[in-house]
Amino acid sequence: SAHDYSAVTMVATKLFYVWEFDRGSAGFTSSATRENGSTLMEVSLEFYIPKITGVVNEDLMMLATSCGITAIIETYADDCAAPAVTYMFVLGWDEIFEETAYMEFTSGEQGTGTGLQTANGTAITLTCQQGEYPREYSGTQASIPIV
């Protein structure tokens, strides 16, 4: 479509990190507002990382102190197709603000719980303002430069 990106080009030292989540523990929202003829999208990405470990906390510190985060997220259409149909969207970059639309670490709430069956993990929120709704990423996952 005309509202997608088909490739990702990165500076050699800047790569994507892969985070995977349990079903129902991650998602994004994009809320548009218009004022004085300008439209802004408030984009929020929320996800839950289970288990608190030293390695997880090291990764979380890198995320919490990063400046300029762009995320490519994958969502499922959940239409019972086999294999499942997925869509990927780019958050933190658009054709209006470009790299200045980057996402920032907004909050991270970590807890171990009090019982044996209580969840143990961290809820993370990243946010940004964009000048347009998130664009679909139509390239392949294999073409995304990752660590």
What are these regions (language model features)?
Residues 94-147:
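Mixed-charge, glycine-accented linear interaction segment located at domain edges/termini
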Residues 20-94:
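Structured, beta-strand-rich domain cores
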